[in-house]
Each structure stands twice: as C-alpha cells, then as structure tokens.
Regions:
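A generic structural signal for short hydrophobic patches within well-formed alpha-helices
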Residues: 28-29, 139
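A short, polar/proline- and glycine-enriched secondary-structure boundary/capping micro-motif
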Residues: 32-36, 143-146
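Polybasic "coupling" helices that flank or enter modular domains
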Residues: 15, 33-103
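Phosphate-/nucleic-acid-contacting segments
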Residues: 78-156
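Cyclic nucleotide-binding regulatory domains
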Residues: 1-17
Length: 156
C-alpha cells in the first residue's frame, strides 16, 4: 500500500463459510488519505500485526526448535484454548503434526519427537479433535515467556 509492491507473502484459509470483501488498493489509499480517523485505526491495526510477527520471529529465532514449539502451543492456547484451571488448557482446534511443524518452521519428525516427549512427561495429551496442555506454566517457564498481551500472543 502506498507503494508499488505487487508481492504478498501471506495466504488465508477460511475455517468456516465466509464472505470476502475486496477493495482496490487505490480506493483504500484514497479512503485513508481522506479520513484521518480511519488512517489512525489502520495504523493501530498495522502496529499490532507487526508486533505479532516480531514476537513470533523472536521466538522462532532465539528459542530454538523446542522454544518454537512451546511458543506455538502457547499461542494456540491463547487463540483457541479453553482454560480449564489455572494451569490446564483445552485447545479445540485440531491440527496435524505437519501443520504444527509448519507453524514452527521445522520438520514433522522433530515435532513428533518433541510432542511425544511432552506427552511422556504429562505436559500435554492428544485426542483426535483436541489437544490438552496439562502444565501451561511449564511451557511459559521454559521459554522465559514475557507475558505479552493476549492480542499479540496469538496465532491469527
């Protein structure tokens, strides 16, 4: 926007029936330049999105593969989780190990090993339609979680 870059590095997959609204770039640029309040809200949204990406990149780069998995599980819990107790979270969003590996920028085999290790230590458990984190604080402690606001520490 406001420049001539035609490359977009994101894809979207609808999880339920959705309607798509499309605006030409020029139309949005015109709306933003004519409406300062809309521009401010847009900039706030952009800043939050930037903070989400920065924190995810930080976790992937600084915490290694295990930290990437732990931070991804924390983000999944914050986005789709139902907190059952102070330390247990039910994630009602089915993901394959391949999908989790893609979120962590690592291989499925590596994720399988780490998830099985967490399962062996009763940190998490799996079911076909959901995953349960039994020791949420353990994951946070392992990556020295900074307790980012929930609108930042999310998958979406």
């Amino acid at each position: 926007m406001f420049c001539k870059v035609n490359y977009h590095s994101v894809t979207v997959k609808a999880l339920e029936t959705s309607q798509l609204l499309s605006l030409h770039t020029h139309t949005l640029e015109l709306l933003l330049s004519e409406n300062p309040q809309l521009l401010v809200e847009y900039l706030k949204w952009l800043q939050i999105e930037n903070m989400k990406h920065q924190s995810r990149l930080r976790d992937l780069v600084l915490n290694g593969k295990k930290g990437a998995l732990f931070s991804t599980l924390i983000r999944l819990a914050n986005t789709y989780g139902e907190f059952r107790s102070d330390n247990e979270v039910l994630i009602k969003f089915p993901l394959t190990n391949t999908e989790i590996a893609n979120l962590c920028a690592t291989s499925r085999e590596m994720i399988n090993r780490m998830l099985n290790d967490l399962k062996k230590h009763h940190i998490i458990s799996f079911d076909k339609s959901y995953n349960t984190i039994h020791d949420f604080q353990f994951l946070k402690d392992e990556i020295a979680c900074e307790n980012c606001p929930l609108n930042i520490c999310r998958i979406d």
